[in-house]
Amino acid sequence: MAGVKAGLYLQSSVSALRGVGPALVSRLQHMDLWRVQDVLFHLPSRYQDRRHIASMATLQAGQERAILGEIVRVDHQRGGREQWLVTVSDGSGCLQIRLFHMALALRAQWQVGRRLWCFGELRGGFHGLEMIHPEWQMADVPQFQAPHHLTPFYPSSEGITQAQWRRWIAHALTLLDQLPDYLENRLPPQWPGLREGLRLLHESADEIPSPQHPAWQRLALEELLANHLAVRRMRQSGMMQNAPCLRSKGQMWQRFLAHLPFSPTMAQERVIAEINADLARHRPMRRLLQGDVGSGKTLVAAAATLTALEAGYQVAMMAPTEILAEQLHARFQQWLEPLGLEVGYLVGSRSPRVRRETAEALAGGRLSLVIGTQSLFQEGVAFACLGLVIIDEQHRFGVEQRRQLLEKGAMPHLLVMTATPIPRTLAMTVHADLEVSVIDALPPGRTPVETLVMPDSRRPELIGRMQHMLEAGRQIYWVCPLIEESEILELQAAEASVADLQAALPGVAVGLIHGRMRSAEKAEVMAAFQSGAVRILVATTVIEVGVDVPGASLMIIEHAERLGLAQLHQLRGRVGRGAQRSSCILLYHPPLSGKARERLRVMRETYDGFSIARKDLELRGPGEYLGTRQAGILQMRVANILRDEALLAMVPALAERLLQEDPEAVQAIVQRWLGNRVDYGQVG
């Protein structure tokens, strides 16, 4: 193969590999393996050491061993399930090989006197130790080769065997010399080059390579770099656009503060200043605002909104659910209507006439502020001069949804907010398209919620505690989490809890809110709870974000072992919003798994959202932690964002150097690792 042709061959379809026909091409593509080069970067998940031949005299049940010996007996048993029992000896002892379903062509090979190599797991049989269907080769033929390196095992699905993987990768490795190393002389000198590292990981002859091995680290760093560069490319494409300059004298903000019964915290003032500086520029703001539950992100959003409105531009604020959108709308009405500002509301449950009138007011410029759900970026909704988009609970939306809403304006500024904090090193990769601001202090008067963990068997004791709190005029949340992703079972569990509470606490008004209710029904129940007419609110996790009822000071979460740390922390944040001391009780049903026990321990001992987020990331891993929408391009083949945190710290400086010195390498690295998963023209 000529060099240039081989180099191009790495970019060819996997169909170029020996033995890969149309059916296998489809299976490989389902695993996101499209090119020969992709197969090279499909790394082993584990290894077996088959290089050493074990003496049969030393074998023990439960071991995995390679043996080499002579076939001394072959028994063909036809009674019941047809099988072959082959006895092999190496002079020190004997071993029986048990085989089923042997093809005719293979049966002829199993002859007394032939030499046989086998690898498999040993187990006790009727006649001593045996292997059932081991991997084997006849050792008395010229083509026999005993393994001279560790045997790799590859992640697999779609019915692809390990033998197929090893054959394809051996083929791809013949092209390794044509693989360019774009990071040569830019990495620690003790690390191998790209080609050397790949060969070592596929054909390791010494130690079993762990994720801490320099070869693994070399590839993990390049993958992290590719993801960082891809998201950064999106950001840079947005920075080249002109955005409206939203300068204001702060007159609306000062009038707003005059009506506010409290003052912003220093952390809020710092973040507001960062946002206002962004808004005053002619390039589009792309900023992520992270803040713990109850840290005051909504007030910061109000400050940004007033800056945009005073500058003469429209503002759109999007929430992931109607119940949260309704809460935001009510809050902004309370804050802004005294200033003479109308707050629009656009959600799917509103009547077609109201939605049409709201859309017409936005298009005509008669309405400057609208709060809603995904309805905001549907067809038929246009803005006269959209200057600022605010997205609450950012982790619920993907890049595509953000982009659709941004397209409603010429190039509006973007502020995304989340109470699900992401550790800084992770944010540098996940949100390389966004500047990050953090509200790192709670408003004065907010005290940590006392958190107790108790088994469900102590429910009678809990009812007594609830009775005492109700007599003191308090309100209570009772949360029933989703059961097996079934809304019907969820509803049944919630209704059963309502019946139990009504029986245990006669005369107490108990409300119910669940996922199968219409938005108007949910809003009615929430209004009754906020007014105090409903004393206990039984709910599913639909109340986990944004709901604000200062009179609620006790949160009880049933089956707390089913929920993740982020959900538990979000739910706990619904109490402790008034002046009184608040509590959260986590009810669990034993036995607990190790991870569930650890989650409940963290909740009992920790109130800091960033510490909880870090632990959540450790327990769940980056993919599950971020979710499919938010993870986006972070479907890592080699790297692990948590494990490779030290590598993440190296990425920004390396990316900066590459962008300045070798822009072509940037494109090639991103293409190598992400293929067609990134649309470089998109703005994050």
From Swiss-Prot:
Domain annotation Helicase ATP-binding: ranges: 278-439
Annotated motif DEAH box: location in the chain?
Answer: 392-395
- For this protein, what is any one GO molecular function term? ATP binding
Q: What keywords would UniProt list here? A: ATP-binding, DNA damage, DNA recombination, DNA repair, DNA-binding, Helicase, Hydrolase, Isomerase, Nucleotide-binding
Annotated region described as Wedge domain, given as residue ranges: 51-148
Asked if the record carries the keyword Nucleotide-binding, the reply is yes
Q: Which SUPFAM superfamilies match?
A: Nucleic acid-binding proteins (SSF50249), P-loop containing nucleoside triphosphate hydrolases (SSF52540)
Q: Which amino acids does the record list as binding ATP?
A: 291-298
EC number from the UniProt entry: 5.6.2.4
CDD domains assigned = RecG_wedge_OBF
Q: Please, one GO biological process term?
A: DNA repair
Q: What catalytic activity does the UniProt entry give for this protein?
A: Couples ATP hydrolysis with the unwinding of duplex DNA by translocating in the 3'-5' direction; ATP + H2O = ADP + phosphate + H(+)
Q: Which class of enzymes does this protein belong to?
A: isomerase
UniProt record similarity statement: Belongs to the helicase family. RecG subfamily.
Q: What does this protein do?
A: Plays a critical role in recombination and DNA repair. Helps process Holliday junction intermediates to mature products by catalyzing branch migration. Has replication fork regression activity, unwinds stalled or blocked replication forks to make a HJ that can be resolved. Has a DNA unwinding activity characteristic of a DNA helicase with 3'-5' polarity.
Extract the NCBIfam families matched here.
Answer: PRK10917.1-1 (NF008163), PRK10917.2-2 (NF008168), recG (TIGR00643)
The molecule here is called ATP-dependent DNA helicase RecG
State the organism named in the record: Acidithiobacillus ferridurans
**Biological classification of the source:** Bacteria, Pseudomonadati, Pseudomonadota, Acidithiobacillia, Acidithiobacillales
